[in-house]
Amino acid sequence: NAAAGNVTIEDIGTDVNDVAITGGTISVDGTIETADLSTSDAGGITLTGAVTLAGNVTLDTDSSNGPISVTGAVDATNSGTQTLTISSGSGAVDFGGVIGGTTAIGDTTINASGSGTIALAGIGDANDVGAIIGTTAIGNTSTAGITFDGTNYKCGNPAGGSDTVTITATGTGQVIDFTGGAATVASFGGNAATTGNAITFSTGTIDLDNANNLTITSDGGAISVAGIRGDSSETVTITANVT
């Protein structure tokens, strides 16, 4: 706990039950992994403060099914280079800050398996540029719910790339929720010769809270949505040929 100071972390292994780190900036390089060492407390990871990816980073509580919480912004050291992998089993994942809002991160996977819920405050900002450069995979067919509680979710292809954005949750019910206001999900090409990522909401119906209009756009990438429902009279705009 460094309060307003900076904290630098490399690997933390499986002989730790809980990890809680607080700092003005938390620099992470490597894997933080918890173990199920307590009968009363599922091993979790809490990062309180802004996080910088100094290398490829994995946060893993899969063996303990513990929660993963990151309260601040998450940025890469070099745009589109450092990757992020999250695995929490049945534990909840919550990103309270914007991902890639200042410096875009690389390929990102959040819960390729497990039923844990996922909450994301934002990917990028109002600028028309991808905040995750590469492949983005959020959830899987067992994910109990995904909540987008911000307004901007913007990904991008690297120059010459053909990466994808895939959001997946259980196919039962309206389990992909937009709750933070009028939201935009968008993808952008890396240059004039590169289309934006294909965007796929593969399973799980999108639910739009009252007055939470939704815009989905791409620079030519295909867009596929399994289903959308609104709570009142929300507006949905889908455009796959924005340039």
Predicted features by range, described:
Residues 1-243:
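Extracellular lectin-like interaction modules
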